[in-house]
Amino acid sequence: TSPRLGITLVLDTRECLVTACFASLGRDPKFPRMPAADLVFGAIRRPDGSLPPKRHSYTADLAGKSIDWNYGSFNIAHVYQTERYYRVAFTPRALQRIMKNNSAMMGGERREAPKEAYEDYMDAVKIRDGLYAVSLLETNLCRRNGHGNNLFFLMNLKEMHDVGRSFGTNGEGEDENYTFGAFGAWFDAKEVMEMPGMYYIH
């Protein structure tokens, strides 16, 4: 049904803080399956009844960094182009794995990376040093194909792994929600940074 709402919480029990992601579908009548996400920063009441004065906050720490994530059956690299936009990159190894295990991701017959970079909106939140909550939207995918997701995940850059969830619709237009985890490795994305974007987001 639309609008549909998904709520995900990141609980920081060390600092008694919380970041909530409110993801939804159906806000845009032109693209009813387009995901949207709002982040809200709050606090957890301490046993003595007090609330900490500080909150989690947006960060530019990830800007210019890129990570090749291994999700088990496929690899995909997230390139954090700026503090507000990300790009997707496919390493040669990732392309081989995708074509072998999940060729539909690349349009079936494609054997090489796109000449332009897919880019879209993101928000990054610093939980503490090396630990970030990241929200990625697939709004441009939705405009092109009629469906998309909001990915929200907690990323540990000291141990190079993440855990998160997807909220949105699949290629058949059905509601899609799943959880995921991945191991990451730093990726040299200089070429991806320099590529023209499909949608020219700057």
Outline where the language-model segments fall:
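Short, hydrophobic/aromatic-rich segments at coil-to-beta transitions
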Residues: 1, 61-67, 83-87, 128-134
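N-terminal glycine/threonine-rich, aromatic-flanked beta-hairpin/loop signature
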Residues: 1, 74-125
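A cross-kingdom feature marking solvent-exposed beta-strand/loop segments within repeated
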Residues: 1-6, 106, 114-121, 125, ...
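Hydrophobic, ordered structural segments
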Residues: 2-45, 142-181
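Short, exposed beta-strand/loop patches in secreted or surface proteins that constitute
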Residues: 9-11, 58-60, 76-81, 122-126, ...
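Surface-exposed beta-loop interaction hotspot
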Residues: 19-71, 186, 190-202
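Beta-strand residues in well-ordered beta-sheet regions across diverse protein folds
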Residues: 21, 70, 89, 135, ...
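A eukaryote-biased signal for long
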Residues: 68-75, 80-81, 107, 148-202
